Amino acid sequence: MLNSHSTQSTPVKNFQNKFLVLTSTPKDFLLLMKPSVMLLAIFTAITGLFIAPNKIRPLLSLIAILCISTGAGAAGAINMWYDADIDRIMKRTRNRPTVTGKISPSTALTFGIILAFFSVLVMAICVNYISSILLLISISFYIIVYTMWLKRRTAQNIVIGGAAGALPPVIGYSAVTNSIDTTCLMLFLIIFLWTPAHFWTLSLYYTNDYKLANVPILPLVKGINYTKYSILAYTFLTVISASLPYFTDIAGLLYLICSTISGIIFLCYASMLFNDRNNILARKMFKYSIIYLFNIFLYLIIEYCIKRFIFLN
C-alpha cells in the first residue's frame, strides 16, 4: 500500500512543481522582487534626478525610475533563486516565495533574467547609454559579486557588495545629465558607507540564523564587540560623508542642520550598542538606519525644491 501511494503521488507532485507559476499571485512576484529594497533604490534614484543640474524631462525621468526599480527587482528575484537553500534555514527568510513553493526556482530565475534584460534595454533605448551601463553594472554586481561570490565566502561581503545598492542615485543623476561627476559620487559614498552599519545591526540580531545557514557574517567571524566597534566606525563615516553636500555647495544650511541632527541620533544608537546585551537595540538601530538614509535624501530634495522656488520667484 505504501509503495502504491508513493508511486501515485510522484506524477502529481511533478505536475504541480512544473506548473507552480499557475498558483502564484501578483503579491508573490512583488515579494520576489524585494519591495523594501526597490523602494530604497527608487527614492535614492529620484534624489539623483532632482539634484542633477540639467532640466528634468518628466517622461524620460519616469522611464528611468521604472527601469531602475525593475532592475532592482530583477536582482532581488535572482538573489532569492540563488539563496533559496539558505533562506529555507533562516527564520527571517523562510517565508520567501521561493522557499514556501509559491514560486518555483526556475520561474524566479526566468522572471529575474527577463526583468533585468528589459530594464537595461529600455534604459539604453529611451534614456541614455551611461545610465543603462550603470544599471547593468549594479544588477550584475549584486548578483555575481555579492550573492554568488562574496556572501558565503567573507565577512566583508556587505562592505564590497554594498556598491551595488549605492548606484541608484548615480544612475538617476546620469539619466538626466548623461554623465558622472563628484555630485552623484557623493551620494554613492553616503550609501556605500551606510550599508555596513545598516546590515551589521541586523546581523547582530539574527546571528544564530546566519550561523545555522553557515553564512560568514562579521559577528560570527570577528565577534560581537568587534562588530559593534565596526558599526560605530561606519556610522561615524556615514555622518561625516552626509555633511559633504553642504561643504561642496550642493545643499545649504538647512540641510546641514537637519542631517546633523539625524546623524547625532544615528551615532547615539551606535554608541549605545555596547550596553545592548540582548541585541534588542540593534534591531531598533537597524530600523532607524533606514529612516536616517531616507531623511538624508529627503533633505536634499527639500533643499532643491526650496532653491527652485526662490529661483522662480
Curated annotation (Swiss-Prot):
Molecular function via GO: protoheme IX farnesyltransferase activity
Membrane topology summary: Multi-pass membrane protein
Domain of life: Bacteria
GO cellular component, as recorded: plasma membrane
Transmembrane segments: 31-51, 58-78, 107-127, 130-150, 157-177, 184-204, 229-249, 250-270, 286-306
UniProt keyword annotations, A-Z: Cell inner membrane, Cell membrane, Heme biosynthesis, Membrane, Transferase, Transmembrane, Transmembrane helix
Pathway it works in: Porphyrin-containing compound metabolism; heme O biosynthesis; heme O from protoheme: step 1/1
GO terms of biological process kind: heme O biosynthetic process
Pfam families referenced in this protein's UniProt entry, alphabetically: UbiA
EC number annotated for this UniProt entry: 2.5.1.141
Gene3D superfamilies registered for this protein in UniProt: UbiA prenyltransferase
Recorded catalytic activity of this chain's protein: heme b + (2E,6E)-farnesyl diphosphate + H2O = Fe(II)-heme o + diphosphate
Subcellular location per the Swiss-Prot or TrEMBL entry: Cell inner membrane
Protein role: Converts heme B (protoheme IX) to heme O by substitution of the vinyl group on carbon 2 of heme B porphyrin ring with a hydroxyethyl farnesyl side group.
Something else known: Carbon 2 of the heme B porphyrin ring is defined according to the Fischer nomenclature.
PANTHER family listed in its UniProt record: 4-HYDROXYBENZOATE SOLANESYLTRANSFERASE (PTHR43448:SF7), PROTOHEME IX FARNESYLTRANSFERASE, MITOCHONDRIAL (PTHR43448)
Record-stated family: Belongs to the UbiA prenyltransferase family. Protoheme IX farnesyltransferase subfamily.
HAMAP family: CyoE_CtaB
Protein name: Protoheme IX farnesyltransferase
Species of the source: Orientia tsutsugamushi (strain Boryong) (Rickettsia tsutsugamushi)
Upper lineage: Bacteria, Pseudomonadati, Pseudomonadota, Alphaproteobacteria, Rickettsiales
Gene that this sequence comes from: ctaB
